[in-house]
Amino acid sequence: MNGTEGPYFYIPMVNTTGIVRSPYDYPQYYLVNPAAYAALGAYMFFLILVGFPINFLTLYVTIEHKKLRTPLNYILLNLAVANLFMVFGGFTTTMYTSMHGYFVLGRLGCNLEGFFATLGGEIALWSLVVLAVERWMVVCKPISNFRFGENHAIMGLAMTWLMASACAVPPLVGWSRYIPEGMQCSCGVDYYTRAEGFNNESFVVYMFCCHFMIPLIIVFFCYGRLLCAVKEAAAAQQESETTQRAEREVTRMVVIMVIAFLVCWLPYASVAWWIFTHQGSEFGPVFMTIPAFFAKSSSIYNPMIYICMNKQFRNCMITTLCCGKNPFEEEEGASSTASKTEASSVSSSSVSPA
């Protein structure tokens, strides 16, 4: 084995020289240069600095503006809450531990950090799935006369929390476990060992299939069908400028959504699966650290894509930030009036996130 396994930890370094120490008790500067820990702390500070305001602003603006309190926006609020879970439960902890060079908060802190980071990430992931399904149901109309209402939104919220809990809770109660990973300053599911009594193998297979592959398939299916529906509508109305513009807007939005989804989750899932299927192989601490923090950056991508690209929310946000007046409202209003010169069966409001 090209690593050192101990009680509730796995260090990706063979202890031939005797320098490997528990990540709960000693700085891990023998793994990488101390400057790397400083860089990690600075990166987490950046995520906190950007992630907290944009997600808090999402909650505040929605509460302040009654017209934003729509059933679909419940899911967007859920997304913001999930991101705040990651900010407070994961980012602040990792920033603090990276400043010390090891997981100074001990086993309890590792469990809490791993749980909140996993819970927040999974709530966000399944919220994106609910959004994708809602867009597919409304635009493609597989069920005629379907209208997304408050009851549907509540069921969607319940599903996101249920699925997230089904992923984050088991390691706390003995099905797998949370251990320090990468540079040993943050905690995640144990992909690294076959520790007796924890059934890591079955949990990793379950997590990869049910909490990565299934969401990925659903998102690709829903947005793929959505894009086809817009193209079909545009082909049926070749002279409709509004429809052509809607097609371009939806195409851009879908491409950005899919790319962001893959950038956030595919590197982490791929590396975790490789480590799991090649246990005992040699890899460095940075090998798992970089993908893990790509996934954490979803707390910034999500609100930018799913909320800031929503014109109605953007106008309300500008109004709030500018103390009740939107300096761009008149210009946008004129543009909106000009764009409504021709009716269309598919409009940008029908295919935007909200």
Curated annotation (Swiss-Prot):
A motif ('Ionic lock' involved in activated form stabilization) lies at residues 134-136. One of its GO terms (molecular function) is 11-cis retinal binding. Glycans are attached at residues 2, 15, 200. A lipid is attached at residues 322-323 (S-palmitoyl cysteine). Disulfide bonds join 110-187. It is a multi-pass membrane protein. Residues 1-36, 97-110, 174-202, 275-286 are extracellular. Phosphorylated on some or all of the serine and threonine residues present in the C-terminal region. Residues 62-73, 134-152, 225-252, 309-354 are cytoplasmic. The chain crosses the membrane at residues 37-61, 74-96, 111-133, 153-173, 203-224, 253-274, 287-308. InterPro entries: GPCR_opsins (IPR050125), GPCR_Rhodpsn (IPR000276), GPCR_Rhodpsn_7TM (IPR017452), Opsin (IPR001760), Retinal_BS (IPR027430), Rhodopsin (IPR000732), Rhodopsin_N (IPR019477). The record marks 113 as: Plays an important role in the conformation switch to the active conformation. Residues 329-354 are annotated as: Disordered. Gene3D superfamilies: Rhodopsin 7-helix transmembrane proteins. It is found in: Membrane; Cell projection, Cilium, Photoreceptor outer segment. GO terms for biological process: absorption of visible light; G protein-coupled opsin signaling pathway; visual perception. Its main location: membrane. The modification N6-(retinylidene)lysine is found at residue 296. Residues 334-354 have a biased composition (Low complexity). CDD domains: 7tmA_MWS_opsin. Photoreceptor required for image-forming vision at low light intensity. While most salt water fish species use retinal as chromophore, most freshwater fish use 3-dehydroretinal, or a mixture of retinal and 3-dehydroretinal. Light-induced isomerization of 11-cis to all-trans retinal triggers a conformational change that activates signaling via G-proteins. Subsequent receptor phosphorylation mediates displacement of the bound G-protein alpha subunit by arrestin and terminates signaling. This is Rhodopsin. It comes from Mullus surmuletus (Striped red mullet).
